């Protein structure tokens, strides 16, 4: 979650993947990773990880220059392959995170809801 303990080349690589290159609504897009100012509501997470967000065109706000992540941020990513689906979310400033691995048929919104519930409890 905090790459400061890694060797310099790895720290730089992680920082580059977390750098924000553009925004769509409340979501900032890095290289694969998507982030939100923390704390973030469940509704904003669901909207940013929705089928509509993934499958439809959206107006983007380019971040020029690209922007490092703010101190309070939730970084997340959904994904699936074969018969498996995953959701990863973490909050570096709180030292909390979760990885959910499930059957691909277990919908993204359900993964996100349970992750948000668990992260909210851990943050207390």
Where are these regions (language model features)?
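Catalytic loop of the DD-peptidase/beta-lactamase superfamily, centered on the K-T-G motif
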Residues: 1-124
């Amino acid at each position: 979650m905090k790459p400061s303990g890694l060797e310099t080349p790895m720290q730089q690589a992680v920082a580059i993947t977390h750098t924000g290159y553009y925004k769509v609504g409340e979501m900032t897009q890095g290289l694969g990773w998507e982030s939100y100012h923390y704390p973030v509501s469940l509704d904003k997470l669901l909207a940013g990880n929705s089928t509509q967000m993934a499958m439809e065109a959206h107006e983007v706000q380019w971040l020029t220059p690209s922007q490092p992540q703010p101190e309070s941020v939730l970084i997340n990513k959904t994904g699936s392959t074969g018969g498996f689906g995953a959701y990863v979310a973490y909050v570096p400033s709180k030292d909390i995170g979760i990885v959910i691995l499930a059957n691909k048929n277990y919908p993204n919104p359900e993964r996100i809801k349970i992750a948000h519930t668990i992260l909210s409890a851990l943050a207390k």
